[in-house]
Amino acid sequence: VSGIPTVGYSLEHPLGLIPGTGRDFLAQLLYGSRISFLVALFTTMTALTIGLFVGIIGGYFRGRIDNYLGRTTDFLLAFPAFFMIVALSEPMVRRIEGTGIAQGNAARILFLIFFLSFFGWPGFSRLIRSQVLSIREREYVTAAQAMGASRTRIILKELLPNLWAPVIVVASLSLPGYLAAEAVYSYLGIGVQPPASTWGILLSNATRYVTVMPSFFLIAAGSLVIVVLAFNLFGDALRDALDPRADR
């Protein structure tokens, strides 16, 4: 296979050089993680904010509002989000570029954050709603209602402070999922494009040399697996710390 650099592993290049380009693999791995984490972090924050708002409204007010929001949530959860993102990637990126909001890879990053958040918030909403339905029946909420506290005050003073623990836990468990999703879409050519670097692009390049230089693919894939696993373990530990009754 042509394009494989002759310089191997060394103190100067601990993970070697990228085939075809001769770039330092460790530097590209670290640099590419910035975009992957950027997409994952902003997607988690956006989806969580929308899900928190919808879940609180539906769980607290119930009735027709909850029924309408619940049907919308069920529809989006059943929707084939992956195929929709694949199908809309090119036309939507061109539309974003046409509006002047962002250009090139910035437009692709914005597209991924928007659509991953759009299809991601229903999962957060369902969890928050179930928590709100439980909290609103507790004595301190009933006491606040009996004292004439407004709905806004009850939501801000009684509900939100008791939702932070599950919110933090679900956010820590969701972030690695979006990190992996960004890698998958970049691998498929939907996300950020070369010469920029993300873990998905590194994996895509590595598959071309997997038979002659398997270490390139194994290091790229292993790095993603380790980071995702680390966040999942952190989320599990955080859940056990914030809610010891979860294992009972």
Residue ranges and their predicted role:
Residues 23-38, 42, 62-70, 133-137, ...:
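Amphipathic cytosolic juxtamembrane alpha-helices at the membrane-cytosol interface
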